[in-house]
């Protein structure tokens, strides 16, 4: 029930990655990357489809060899989500996947080669209307920038990015987005702030090599959260040493927490204490799993006692306040006469949530007639 926060987005040009708009007034897109071997076509397709199911807007696929490029051709034909080909070292791979319908090319300025090779990629992208992502990474800066700055700095990352933006400008190519990633939160944040002031193109956010699921989620939430709250960012990826599906879930959770883009159930739940009259932790865990299929934005509060329960329920679409044996139930902020049997709480609340979703879908369908 809480409204989206009117964060003033940085103004940028709009490009399209496949059918997904990026930049301008488009919603911030959530991206992930496969971690299968691309030549394992069956496994890669299965992972991409799993990412589609949890809402990934764009999926990046590493294409390190020509064999992987041939596999990419097959993969592209069997999935619906736009695919970005991640290209390093060999520019000819970019030319090959362009023939196979890639939706975006990601190149790394630090290792893709000289200007002539970049021009070959740009000319191909122009001919086929394929956008490019310039992906600068603190771990792979050009040698001369490493020598100039001594270590990765915001200025070094910015200089690397602008060096290649200038090349694309000279080639009269403006269908690109830029990232300046680092594993250090402060380095990444300051680099992105500088970049946001320097270019008008869309910006892809990420804290690279952030770590495992727990630490990486925290790093990403802090770094991306800071930037998003300042209006910076048009696409994002949460980089985790974990299942890529988790990257998408955390990405949407970050956007949801900032009330920038809502998708699915937003559970508001207390951390529990000795006052709780219901098993909040078990209830939330069960409902998160059961309701993963729901895409409709909805706030659901599950509070273990009457201290904060009623207040949270007042600003929720559905709310439960724990009480002895039978718990209070709120709908659209209004206390209902109906109460929930604590022993059947999970089933009863799931049914109410699904009924609320169906009601919303029906109302939207009527309005569209």
UniProtKB/Swiss-Prot annotation:
<comment type="pathway">
    <text>Isoprenoid biosynthesis; isopentenyl diphosphate biosynthesis via DXP pathway; isopentenyl diphosphate from 1-deoxy-D-xylulose 5-phosphate: step 5/6.</text>
</comment>
<keyword id="KW-0408">Iron</keyword>
<dbReference type="InterPro" id="IPR045854">
    <property type="entry name" value="NO2/SO3_Rdtase_4Fe4S_sf"/>
</dbReference>
<keyword id="KW-0411">Iron-sulfur</keyword>
<comment type="similarity">
    <text>Belongs to the IspG family.</text>
</comment>
<dbReference type="Pfam" id="PF04551">
    <property type="entry name" value="GcpE"/>
</dbReference>
<dbReference type="InterPro" id="IPR004588">
    <property type="entry name" value="IspG_bac-typ"/>
</dbReference>
<feature type="binding site">
    <location>
        <position position="305"/>
    </location>
    <ligand>
        <name>[4Fe-4S] cluster</name>
    </ligand>
</feature>
<dbReference type="GO" id="GO:0016114">
    <property type="term" value="P:terpenoid biosynthetic process"/>
</dbReference>
<comment type="function">
    <text>Converts 2C-methyl-D-erythritol 2,4-cyclodiphosphate (ME-2,4cPP) into 1-hydroxy-2-methyl-2-(E)-butenyl 4-diphosphate.</text>
</comment>
<keyword id="KW-0479">Metal-binding</keyword>
<feature type="binding site">
    <location>
        <position position="273"/>
    </location>
    <ligand>
        <name>[4Fe-4S] cluster</name>
    </ligand>
</feature>
<keyword id="KW-0560">Oxidoreductase</keyword>
<dbReference type="GO" id="GO:0005506">
    <property type="term" value="F:iron ion binding"/>
</dbReference>
<dbReference type="GO" id="GO:0141197">
    <property type="term" value="F:4-hydroxy-3-methylbut-2-enyl-diphosphate synthase activity (flavodoxin)"/>
</dbReference>
<dbReference type="InterPro" id="IPR011005">
    <property type="entry name" value="Dihydropteroate_synth-like_sf"/>
</dbReference>
<keyword id="KW-0414">Isoprene biosynthesis</keyword>
<dbReference type="GO" id="GO:0046429">
    <property type="term" value="F:4-hydroxy-3-methylbut-2-en-1-yl diphosphate synthase activity (ferredoxin)"/>
</dbReference>
<dbReference type="InterPro" id="IPR016425">
    <property type="entry name" value="IspG_bac"/>
</dbReference>
<feature type="binding site">
    <location>
        <position position="270"/>
    </location>
    <ligand>
        <name>[4Fe-4S] cluster</name>
    </ligand>
</feature>
<keyword id="KW-0004">4Fe-4S</keyword>
<dbReference type="GO" id="GO:0051539">
    <property type="term" value="F:4 iron, 4 sulfur cluster binding"/>
</dbReference>
<dbReference type="GO" id="GO:0019288">
    <property type="term" value="P:isopentenyl diphosphate biosynthetic process, methylerythritol 4-phosphate pathway"/>
</dbReference>
<feature type="binding site">
    <location>
        <position position="312"/>
    </location>
    <ligand>
        <name>[4Fe-4S] cluster</name>
    </ligand>
</feature>
<protein>
    <recommendedName>
        <fullName>4-hydroxy-3-methylbut-2-en-1-yl diphosphate synthase (flavodoxin)</fullName>
        <ecNumber>1.17.7.3</ecNumber>
    </recommendedName>
</protein>
């Amino acid at each position: 029930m809480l409204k989206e926060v009117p964060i003033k987005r940085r103004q940028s040009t709009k490009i399209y990655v496949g059918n997904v708009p990026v930049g301008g007034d488009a919603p911030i897109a959530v991206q992930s990357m496969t971690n299968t071997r691309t030549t394992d076509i069956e496994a890669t397709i299965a992972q991409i489809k799993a990412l589609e199911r949890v809402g990934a807007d764009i999926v990046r696929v590493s294409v390190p060899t020509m064999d992987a490029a041939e596999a990419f051709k097959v993969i592209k034909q069997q999935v619906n989500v736009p695919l970005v080909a991640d290209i390093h070292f060999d520019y000819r791979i970019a030319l090959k996947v362009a023939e196979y319908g890639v939706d975006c090319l990601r190149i790394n300025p630090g290792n893709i080669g000289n200007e002539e090779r970049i021009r070959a990629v740009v000319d191909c992208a122009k001919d086929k209307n394929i956008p490019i992502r310039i992906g600068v990474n603190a771990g792979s800066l050009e040698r001369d920038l490493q020598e100039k700055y001594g270590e990765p700095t915001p200025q070094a990352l910015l200089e690397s990015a602008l060096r290649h933006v200038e090349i694309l400008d000279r080639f009269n190519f403006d269908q690109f987005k830029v990232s300046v990633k680092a594993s250090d939160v402060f380095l990444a944040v300051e680099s992105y702030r500088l970049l946001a002031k320097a270019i008008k193109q869309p910006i892809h956010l990420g804290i690279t090599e952030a770590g495992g699921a727990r630490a990486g989620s925290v790093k990403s939430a802090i770094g991306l959260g800071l930037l998003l709250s300042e209006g910076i960012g048009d696409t994002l990826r949460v980089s985790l040493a974990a299942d890529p599906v988790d990257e998408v879930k955390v990405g949407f959770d970050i956007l949801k927490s900032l009330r920038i883009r809502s998708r699915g159930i937003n559970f508001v739940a207390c951390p529990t204490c000795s006052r709780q009259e219901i098993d909040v932790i078990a209830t939330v865990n069960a409902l998160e799993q059961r309701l993963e299929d729901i895409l409709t934005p909805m706030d659901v509060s599950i509070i273990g006692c009457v201290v904060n329960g009623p207040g949270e329920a007042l600003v929720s679409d559905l709310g439960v306040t724990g009480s002895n044996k039978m718990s209070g139930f709120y709908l659209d902020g209004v206390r209902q006469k109906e109460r929930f049997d604590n022993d059947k709480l999970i089933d009863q609340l799931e049914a109410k949530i699904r009924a609320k979703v169906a009601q919303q879908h029906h109302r939207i369908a009527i309005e569209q007639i």
